[in-house]
Curated annotation (Swiss-Prot):
Keywords recorded for this protein, A-Z: Ribonucleoprotein, Ribosomal protein
Basic and acidic residues bias (residue ranges): 104-122
Family per record: Belongs to the bacterial ribosomal protein bL12 family.
One Gene Ontology term from the biological process aspect of the record: translation
Entry's transmembrane regions: none
Gene Ontology CC: cytoplasm; ribonucleoprotein complex; ribosome
CDD domains noted in UniProt: Ribosomal_L7_L12 (cd00387)
PANTHER family given in the database record: 39S RIBOSOMAL PROTEIN L12, LARGE RIBOSOMAL SUBUNIT PROTEIN BL12M
Reported function: Forms part of the ribosomal stalk which helps the ribosome interact with GTP-bound translation factors. Is thus essential for accurate translation.
Quaternary organization: Homodimer. Part of the ribosomal stalk of the 50S ribosomal subunit. Forms a multimeric L10(L12)X complex, where L10 forms an elongated spine to which 2 to 4 L12 dimers bind in a sequential fashion. Binds GTP-bound translation factors.
UniProt protein name: Large ribosomal subunit protein bL12
Any Pfam family matching the protein: Ribosomal_L12
């Protein structure tokens, strides 16, 4: 019996739990991942002519704030927009850039952007 045949025979006798453990150990040992690669495909437009259609959902991203004196005003506005507590809003502002809201209409996004900019955010 060759080496390969004996390895196949031994692997075939493993339980499911043992096979999972073997997989994890080999991933560590060889520095690889057994995960399947993920492919993202953009949805195809319903009509060929609508390739340049307008975006319908928008995201408001806090990049930071200009003036350290306006930090409190920015935190207050972030709290109003996101319904976060004081501590969470402060951490979010200090760790910018961060997404505040997604899936907004263009008008909602522009309104939030204006409020944040008026408070001193970028």
């Amino acid at each position: 019996m060759s080496n390969i045949e004996s390895i196949v025979e031994k692997l075939s006798s493993l339980t499911l739990i043992e096979a999972a453990e073997l997989s994890k150990r080999l991933e560590k040992e060889w520095g690889v991942s057994a995960s399947a690669p993920v492919s993202v495909v953009a949805p195809v437009a319903a009509e060929a002519g609508s390739a340049a259609s307008e975006k319908t959902e928008f995201e408001v991203v806090l990049k930071g704030f200009d003036d350290p004196k306006k930090k409190i005003a920015v935190i207050k506005e972030v709290r109003a927009i996101t319904d976060l507590g004081l501590k969470e809003a402060k951490e979010l502002v200090e760790s910018a850039p961060k997404s505040l809201k997604t899936g907004l209409s263009k008008d909602e996004a522009n309104e939030m952007k204006k409020k944040l900019e008026d408070a001193g955010a970028t």
